[in-house]
């Protein structure tokens, strides 16, 4: 991955029509599948939100996905947020969209449709200040200490940052997240912080083939949310 990233220009804004068509067709297939699943489950249209993980994708590819109907993006690595944010923000504004926080963005239309920009990967404390001008939600907060650090930075900038508390439902050592038994208490503490908006809980299912085991992880998380 490192070698690949060293050779790809993530700030590139131009892609050919063949690649744009591939992206458009892929986005439409996923959106159609979500709509069918909503209908089958008796859910309201649009109640399931699709976040496009844009790791290793350049600005041009991401904009092609937005042109195809993506309305929420997420980056795994703070370095990629920093590399792509300026170009994405400008091109989104050209299309009447406002990306992420829009902090300090004088180009965004006053009536712009908002495209949330999430950090979905792990966040080191020394990178907090570098991503806050752009991302509006951090999905990988695994404890009070990290939340406090984010809150201090957010208050200093005069903004409010959304966070998801990551819970390690699978119990796998390779996964981050707090202990499920501590999640309610940690969430309550995070919710009290200035500059933080607790938006919910997240987990990554167990890395197994047994669907019942994977579903149990998410079912338990939902039960915790409803506590």
Can you say where each PLM-predicted feature lies in the sequence?
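Conserved alpha/beta-domain cores
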Residues: 2-226
């Amino acid at each position: 991955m490192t070698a690949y990233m060293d050779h790809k220009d993530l700030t590139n804004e131009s892609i050919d029509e063949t690649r744009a068509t591939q992206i458009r067709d892929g986005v439409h297939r996923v959106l159609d599948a979500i709509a069918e699943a909503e209908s089958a489950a008796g859910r309201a249209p649009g109640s399931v939100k699709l976040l496009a993980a844009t790791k290793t994708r350049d600005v041009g590819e991401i904009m092609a996905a937005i042109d195809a109907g993506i309305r929420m993006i997420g980056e795994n690595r703070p370095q990629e947020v920093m590399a792509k944010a300026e170009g994405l923000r400008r091109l989104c504004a050209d299309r009447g969209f406002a990306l992420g926080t829009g902090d300090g963005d004088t180009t965004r239309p006053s009536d712009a449709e908002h495209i949330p920009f999430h950090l979905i990967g792990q966040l080191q404390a020394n990178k907090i200040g570098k991503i806050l001008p752009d991302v509006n939600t951090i999905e990988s907060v695994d404890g009070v200490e990290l939340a406090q650090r984010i809150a201090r930075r957010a208050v200093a900038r005069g903004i409010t940052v959304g966070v998801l508390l990551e819970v390690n439902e699978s119990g796998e050592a390779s996964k981050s997240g707090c202990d499920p038994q501590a999640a309610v208490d940690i969430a309550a503490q995070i919710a009290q912080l200035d500059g933080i908006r607790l938006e919910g809980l997240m987990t990554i299912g167990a890395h197994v083939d047994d669907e019942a085991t994977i579903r149990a992880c998410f079912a338990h998380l939902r039960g915790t949310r409803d506590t």
